[in-house]
Amino acid sequence: MKQPKNVDIPSERTVYRVMEEIGISHHPRRKPNGITKADREARKSEDLLKRDFHAEEPLTKCVTDMTEIKGCDGKLYVSAIFDCFDSSVIGLAMDTNMKASLCKETLENAAKAYPSIRGVIIHSDRGSQYTSQLYREAIQKYGIQQSMNSAGGRCHDNARCESMWARMKTELLYDRYDTEKMTTDELKTIIWRYFTSYWNIRRICSTNRGLPPMIKRQQYYASLKEAA
């Protein structure tokens, strides 16, 4: 799909200004706080990205992380894999626990949606979920290159993921829902819809020059066909 002709896509700054005028806040109210804990005894993988989150092609560099949201019946843990090429979510899973099985499920969902995922670099923090045998076996099964934050667990090493979680919570949750009055099943529904129906398909992204992730991806593959 190509960008419609004669349609001006507003800049992110313009969108934020209009949001301010109509009373919709876009400012995050909470600082991102990592929830995964490192297993000091576990084997770590090398930092292959070294804070370089730029990708010229889809499925070359991805980042993954988890975040938590409090509901009335407990916490919901959201795990996602973002493609650095266009900021799209290529894998998503949610559960009421933050075990390694949740990260494995996220990886499996990405592999189902994108069978060509083999060879991609997926970067994470050094949380025990990502150093677990269960997750490493899934990484090997799909031929993925595992990358992790450098020693010391510096938050900036996975800043791309932290930024995306902050945007999701700001746009979807803050000032719109009282999540602590919602069940985890209700939270699952709105978060799933947000990423699959809005984030990937309709949300403008400044790093994509104002294009939604899937539009940028489609234009990339269309350009390859034209060049062939």
PLM features per residue range, with description:
Residues 15, 19, 49, 65, ...:
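Mobile genetic element proteins and their domesticated derivatives, centered on retroelements
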Residues 11, 45, 59, 78, ...:
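Hydrophobic (often cysteine-bearing) scaffold residues that line and stabilize catalytic clefts
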Residues 140, 166-228:
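C-terminal domain-tail junction helix/linker
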Residues 70, 74, 92-115, 131:
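Active-site beta-loop-alpha junctions of metal-dependent nucleic acid enzymes
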Residues 86-92, 146-149, 174-176:
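Short small-residue beta-strand/loop micro-motif enriched in glycine and branched aliphatics
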Residues 51-90, 96:
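An active-site-proximal beta-strand-loop segment
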Residues 35-38, 124-126, 132-136, 148-170, ...:
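RNase H-like two-metal-ion nuclease catalytic core shared by retroviral integrases
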